[in-house]
Curated annotation (Swiss-Prot):
One CC-aspect GO term: plasma membrane
Superkingdom, taxonomy of origin: Bacteria
Recorded family membership: Belongs to the UPF0397 family.
Protein known as: UPF0397 protein VF_1566
Location in or out of the cell: Cell membrane
Membrane-crossing residue ranges in chain numbering: 8-28, 41-61, 75-95, 110-130, 147-167
Alphabetically ordered keywords of this record: Cell membrane, Membrane, Transmembrane, Transmembrane helix
Membrane topology label: Multi-pass membrane protein
Length: 183
């Protein structure tokens, strides 16, 4: 995999923002070892703008950073889950044929965005929950409850914040595509 210098910088910035923004002091505790993180909107934004590879790496590296700085040790199962969430949300520009770059973001695009966020959270953190029960002998009911809360909460958070960001981004892109040079 050959990543350009720009892509590496984007991944570093995204991972830093997602990682630091994911610290407990910026989250809302909702269940045992479970926090709703507004930083999920950062992961969604970088994934939508730069695609699945950047989305995966921002989620994976960023969650690793969160775990390192939080002091509870790196939980690779949940680090992987965040990477999968970013990768799935990163399918948005492929599915929508990068319409947002042309200044288009309609209800259908928003629905696609929310569905990707939901499936990304269910599949990504579902993988984490499954691996926790196998590798760490975590109680199934606990990790299943974590999964349900995280999937619902993150999808809601990503949908609300993401709508405003992506809608405004599309408007900005549309304005810049309408600019013409005077003769």
């Amino acid at each position: 995999m050959n990543l350009s210098a720009k892509t590496v910088v984007v991944i570093a910035i995204g991972a830093a923002l997602y990682g630091i923004g994911g610290l407990p002091m910026f989250g809302i505790p909702v269940f045992a070892n479970t926090t709703l993180k507004p930083a999920m909107a950062v992961l969604a934004l970088f994934s939508v703008l730069y695609g699945p590879i950047v989305g995966f790496l921002v989620g994976f590296i960023g969650h690793w950073v969160t775990d390192l700085f939080a002091g509870w040790g790196v939980w690779l199962t949940w680090v992987l889950g965040s990477g999968i969430v970013g990768m799935i949300i990163g399918l948005f520009p492929i599915i929508t044929k990068n319409r947002i770059e042309s200044g288009l973001f309609d209800k259908k695009d928003f629905l696609i965005f929310v569905v990707l966020a939901f499936f990304g959270n269910v599949f990504g953190y579902g993988t984490s929950a499954f691996l926790d029960t196998i590798l760490y002998a975590e109680p199934f009911t606990k990790v299943f409850m974590q999964l349900c809360i995280i999937a619902a909460g993150n999808t809601f958070l990503i949908a609300i914040v993401g709508y405003f960001i992506l809608n405004n981004l599309a408007k900005r892109k549309k304005q810049s595509t309408n600019l013409t040079e005077a003769p």
